[in-house]
Amino acid sequence: MGYANALEYLDTKLQEERTLIIETLIQGKLEEGEYKRLCGALQGLDLARNQIKDLAKRMEDE
């Protein structure tokens, strides 16, 4: 698979990590602390993906 640019690559890798975390969460076998940690990781990944999308838009507009 080719990537148009570095931002697309980063977004794809973050989405892959997000998918792995969600697959772990839906198994329902986590202790409370691990569940909270993974939920926080999801929030961080979503924030990072939003920042990447914002940066890509700003770069297009220049």
Where are these regions (language model features)?
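Intrinsic-disorder/low-complexity regions
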Residues: 4, 10, 45, 60-61
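Short, charge-rich amphipathic interface segments used for partner binding and complex assembly
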Residues: 23, 27-60
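N-terminal acidic leader/helix
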Residues: 1-27
